[in-house]
Amino acid sequence: MGLFDIFRPTDINEELKTMKETPGAVLLDVREVDEYEEEHIPDSVNIPLSEFDQIENMHYEKDTPLFVYCHSGRRSGAAVLRLRELGYTNAKNIGGIIHYKKV
């Protein structure tokens, strides 16, 4: 996966299906707390991008499948870049909640 693939639009609904089929996967919402409280995808964990160094306190293994979303996909792309800098090898930007369809 190349650098620009991190920001390439994906279908969040398809990615969520993949996440549910992936053992040990974590759904990570990197929006601010107030955005998360207003609306979020069930079973997601909120770590705002602005407080992202907290990820190290979550004790995820470096190869944990992390499916990352935000509002539109931009912050989640930045979060995936930061995760890679921190050594996480299995993080994926799945886009924005604005395209999420509740099923």
What are the residue ranges of the model-derived segments?
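Conserved beta-strand scaffold positions in the cores of enzyme catalytic domains, especially
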Residues: L27, S44-N46, A91-N93
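Residues at the C-termini of beta-strands that transition into short coil/loop
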Residues: F7, R31, P48-S50, G95
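Catalytic cysteine-centered active loop of the rhodanese-like fold, especially the PTP/DSP P-loop
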Residues: M58-Y100
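Short loop/helix-cap segments at secondary-structure boundaries that form the rim of catalytic
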Residues: Y36-P42, K101
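Flexible, polar/low-complexity N-terminal or interdomain linker segments that lie immediately upstream
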Residues: M1-E38
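Helix-loop module immediately N-terminal to the HCX5R catalytic loop
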Residues: D43-F67
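Acidic phosphotransfer microenvironment of two-component signaling modules
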Residues: D34, E51-D53, I98
